[in-house]
């Protein structure tokens, strides 16, 4: 079955509606990296591990790391491929396995970017993730039609500089939505 994508959501945020009960996505903001006829791929940007830090990650990879890299937050990117490391970052964007998402944001998952981050010469800003979120063809469109998500344009301030605990509400506020006023029941006209 062919799924026609009206407009790619790459570079946009998905904001979980308050009624979304999936524990992986409740109160989440997900940055969409890829959205096409083959499905969608994104990274949850407002959840982090309590017990996994940059030090833990770089130690497991046998990479010596500077103090700033050891203190790097490791984010829970989603429930898929939880053993894989992904990096959302600004410039420079020319790493071995990079996908430029916007003029200012790329996603990479190669060893060279991780070595650069560990050495203190990686891209700034950057966020490290374990795991990702993925949708089969048509799945994200169905979830949007069910009102599981709001969408809003991506912006670097929310992505890289807003505290994690504020991202869900700030993303909604960026499109004029007060999440506290939304009903848990969806309707269609």
From Swiss-Prot:
Pfam family, any one: DUF179
Domain of life: Bacteria
Record InterPro entries: AlgH-like
GO cellular component: cytosol
PANTHER family named among the record's database cross-references: UNCHARACTERIZED PROTEIN YQGE, UPF0301 PROTEIN YQGE
Family: Belongs to the UPF0301 (AlgH) family.
Protein's name according to its UniProt entry: UPF0301 protein Dalk_3037
Native source species: Desulfatibacillum aliphaticivorans
